[in-house]
């Protein structure tokens, strides 16, 4: 723990704490927190550069001689995208039991592209270790959501046991004055600052809550590849060194001993090898000459071994599965593959719990604006359903649904199936289809009844006509 100007503290994981007895951040404490976050931003930006493929080896001093290859094994990009796709590749289902409230919720989510923003928040969490979502009102007074990276934003919590949000800070550098400028969001007001000067005027905060939430996958606020950065750097170095050696020995040296090739007597060998497949000398001593290429040291097996070991350790320590591994290409059983994915699934389950808490806090802010749903306390009734993005065995999923039929409710069964995105809508569709079938059956039944009545009427008419004809014949005979 580190103290900042006496009132503020910084805990492990770059967590900022401030006294709950204060109404707002002291300007000096605000600047101290901001300077410290700018310092931490160097690590955040370094992680982003690694994700983008700009690794440290590319910035090292150039060699004065020999090959100087700089190879980058961009495993951070693979690890982040694989894990984020596994976690949010299937958008989580966020629903309410009340039909009208749920429709309003889904409408707000769709209007704000919430699932896309949530995926980006998850991605930033994997890269930086944390990300922020904040709520605001646009020019039409509609409730909207945006996200911010920790490179230019941070959250300050109070020093109580609950660690409630005290303030959310966004900042940027003013291009004209060159001063750091930003906004501080409190639960009851919003203040603007430029440099060390905080404006006296306040903007109203209609939410009565700090309008931002921090997302993270673990309490330590570590990114998904933070623990393997040194291994990745070493892999880059080994691959580059191997490429240098291959290029160096491609320029093979020819050793010629005991052979006089100085034809013009200038003391230099005259060996024209271009286009020739032989070396000829009329000297009788040439029979004992030694002509061969200098062979390179055979360190290839050792290099391949350390490369394989580094790659294996990177996936093992990061706990993200290597989907290109032979284990996923063979005919392994489903249980065996589940064990291969177990570390990543455990990590995703922990991240799911953290995200569920953060999402509930976020929707509490959204619902407090009284625009999305009528019940401001509906955030307590939200249902979150995260599904890990795994290949779907349709036959197995169908069998599971069939086995659950009659054992649990349809909604519960549908929630446990990856074939169905929205259980409530699926139930509504099934009920609608069933009602349509009933209506069609009734129509067919009514049509059949009418047809039978018409047929009976025709038969009756025929009988009446026949009776009349018979009566007329009897009269004529009389």
Feature locations, PLM:
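Short secondary-structure junctions and interdomain/linker hinges
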Residues: 41, 55, 86, 90, ...
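Short amphipathic alpha-helical segments
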Residues: 100-101, 109-117, 125, 227, ...
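A short, surface-exposed helix-loop junction/capping segment
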Residues: 102-105, 290-292, 341
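Extended, charged amphipathic alpha-helical segments
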Residues: 201-336
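C-terminal helix-loop subdomains that flank or include functional centers
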Residues: 270, 277-284, 302, 309-478
């Amino acid at each position: 723990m580190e103290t900042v100007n006496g009132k503020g503290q910084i805990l492990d994981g770059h967590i900022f704490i401030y006294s709950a007895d204060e109404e707002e951040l002291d300007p000096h404490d605000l600047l101290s927190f901001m300077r410290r976050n700018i310092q931490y931003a160097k690590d955040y930006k370094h992680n982003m550069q690694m994700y983008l493929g700009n690794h440290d080896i590319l910035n090292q001093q150039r060699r004065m001689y020999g090959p100087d290859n700089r190879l980058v094994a961009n495993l951070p990009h693979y690890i982040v995208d694989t894990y984020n796709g596994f976690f949010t590749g299937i958008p989580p289902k966020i629903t309410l039991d009340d039909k009208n409230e749920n429709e309003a919720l889904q409408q707000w989510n769709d209007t704000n592209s919430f699932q896309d923003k949530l995926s980006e928040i998850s991605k930033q969490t994997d890269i930086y270790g944390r990300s922020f979502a904040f709520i605001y009102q646009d020019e039409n007074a509609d409730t909207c959501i945006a996200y911010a990276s920790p490179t230019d934003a941070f959250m300050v919590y109070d020093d109580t046991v609950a660690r409630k949000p005290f303030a959310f800070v966004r900042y940027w550098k003013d291009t004209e004055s060159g001063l750091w400028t930003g906004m501080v969001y409190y639960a009851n007001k919003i203040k603007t600052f430029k440099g060390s000067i905080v404006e006296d005027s306040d903007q109203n905060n209609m939410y009565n809550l700090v309008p931002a939430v921090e997302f993270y996958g673990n309490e330590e606020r570590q990114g998904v590849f933070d623990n393997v950065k040194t291994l990745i750097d070493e892999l880059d170095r080994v691959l580059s060194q191997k490429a240098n050696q291959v290029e160096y020995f491609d320029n093979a040296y020819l050793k010629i001993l005991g052979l006089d090739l100085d034809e013009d007597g200038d003391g230099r060998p005259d060996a024209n090898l271009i286009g020739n497949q032989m070396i000829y000398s009329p000297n009788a001593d040439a029979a004992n000459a030694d002509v061969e290429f200098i062979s390179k040291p055979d360190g290839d097996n050792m290099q391949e071994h350390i490369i394989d070991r580094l790659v294996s350790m990177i996936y093992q320590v990061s706990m993200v599965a290597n989907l290109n591994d032979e284990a996923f290409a063979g005919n392994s059983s489903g249980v065996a593959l589940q064990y291969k994915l177990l570390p990543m699934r455990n990590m995703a389950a922990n991240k799911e719990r953290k995200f569920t808490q953060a999402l509930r806090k976020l929707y509490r802010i959204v619902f407090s604006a009284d625009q999305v749903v009528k019940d401001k306390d509906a955030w307590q009734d939200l249902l979150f359903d995260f599904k890990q993005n795994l290949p779907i065995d349709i036959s197995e999923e169908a069998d599971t649904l069939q086995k659950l039929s009659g054992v649990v409710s349809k909604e519960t069964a549908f929630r446990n199936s990856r074939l169905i995105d929205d259980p409530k809508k699926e139930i509504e569709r099934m009920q609608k289809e069933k009602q349509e079938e009933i209506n069609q059956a009734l129509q067919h039944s009514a049509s059949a009844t009418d047809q039978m009545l018409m047929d009976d009427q025709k038969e009756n008419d025929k009988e009446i006509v026949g009776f009349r004809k018979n009566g007329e014949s009897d009269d004529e005979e009389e």
